């Protein structure tokens, strides 16, 4: 693709996926400052919500410091050009929640399902279109199905009204050829005017590389976050992707140096756990585990005296997917029983 001619759509996810990295504790002031900086730097959209989307604030996923509506309103009041986006996972968020997000200023919604469950997105995509929102399909854990089956799910979202469908590497487990194959499969079945997007995670340090490959295959929208702020080892770092895109001569519309300043001055200082590739986050990518399981698994490991890596690898072996955070404690207890067979006999 000649991206010098085609403008890439840059979708920032610092204030949604990045919420996972700090257990959903962004203050309203953080949101205002980060949204304003992103707007000044020229991104096209800024996604805002609890890490698990609208109404994700719960015992299962972790309580947010504020409501989604409070965060969205703060961001909407802080931008002049960028659109405010949000994320909705059917079964967590409802059309009622989407209406409130719209009223607060959200104009883009990404309706997120597991990569084989696009059928549950219909109601929410329909409603988004009724509201006049940009309705986007978001196929999570895209490494867990074949390119052809993923394309079938993308086509389903298109028929439900999605104007763009994303390949979402929630586990940061896809290699570059696997990304290439998925985009080729999607392009083969989607209408020419239906856009595609790439949402990468950096667990195998391929977040930027996979995003570049996606663009080479005709991808229209790229998700990224300041300093990679996101679940697991984070997303494709926005400032790094923009630097790489600029060296390719691609048209991205962003101010690289403003992004670099925002990443280091506003976002990195908020990290209570470094967002990076390390023993635990590498295990996520290697085992193909949902990236937002990281902080939950670390808590369980500390509580039960286990290694986080062991919990993550077992979650991968069991093919757990987003939404099954409650199973992390079950897995930890099972591992504990294996380590202490005498104790298990006493139950």
Curated annotation (Swiss-Prot):
Its EC number is 4.1.3.39. Mn(2+) binds at residues 17, 199, 201. The active site is at residue 20. It is an enzyme of class 4 (lyase). Substrate binds at residues 16-17, 170, 199, 290. GO terms for molecular function: 2-isopropylmalate synthase activity; 4-hydroxy-2-oxovalerate aldolase activity; manganese ion binding. Belongs to the 4-hydroxy-2-oxovalerate aldolase family. This is 4-hydroxy-2-oxovalerate aldolase 2. It comes from Burkholderia cenocepacia (strain ATCC BAA-245 / DSM 16553 / LMG 16656 / NCTC 13227 / J2315 / CF5610) (Burkholderia cepacia (strain J2315)).
